[in-house]
Amino acid sequence: MLKTRIITALILAPIAIGGIFFLPPLGFALFTGGIITLGAWEWANMSGIVAPAARVAYALVVAAVLYGLLNVPAVAVLWLALFWWILCFLLVRSYPGGSERWGSVAARAIMGLLVLVPAWVGLNHIRTGGFEFGDSTNNLLVILYVFCVVWVADIGAYFAGRAFGKAKLAPRVSPGKSWAGVWGGLVAVAVFAIIIGMLASATVGQSLLLVIASLVTGLVSVLGDLLESMLKRFRGIKDSSQLLPGHGGIMDRIDSLTAAIPVFALIITLMGWLTTGQW
């Protein structure tokens, strides 16, 4: 199992790095759109769409929505994402209560649109936008930063959870997660943000805002993970798919990012660090 995970990671890493950091904006949009479309194919299964043709059709609908949003103001979609993730907090908190309201195939399919589409919009808003924070103007580093926030939060949560994780966060959704893990992840994210602020020669005020933005993003990333866990538990499946041998599916790898990316993109836009760009 470990060997399979390593081989898959070694194959995917250069593809991901090349697609994210070396493609022009339109190529980046197509590359990330392909990932989101594959994620939509997986989400169809989590929605209860079983027929292969129907799953493909759902993925194509999501791809069509992405195309239709190419010239729609990104900020409007990002605001929608923020309100959606606030609602998700209530859904996860009440589970299994309330599942009769969102448990239909149609409702879960719509949930997929609300998760996947804003993530793509947020990524491409960052990729095409103008960026300035401290002495940094490289928007590709923003994408790397939000990825790192999620990874740092996961690492901090893992070690804090193992050491102090007695009080469970959402035992009916994800029994392995603990409140200690959440706090440990947030502490790690705060330290990481302070270090990045120093490296970017940011002012004290900018660094403080970065810490706040990163903490909010870290919290929301937990919701992304919990939402997918809730849907898989409701559906009775362990992984979103087996597209990535040893790792499960694409959604199993990007669930936290689907929440973190649009929220972080919105926050830094409101702060004036990120401005709308052109294709």
Regions found by a protein language model. Give the residues of each.
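Interfacial helix-loop-helix junctions of multi-pass membrane proteins
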Residues: 227-243
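Final/C-terminal transmembrane alpha-helix of multipass membrane proteins
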Residues: 253-269
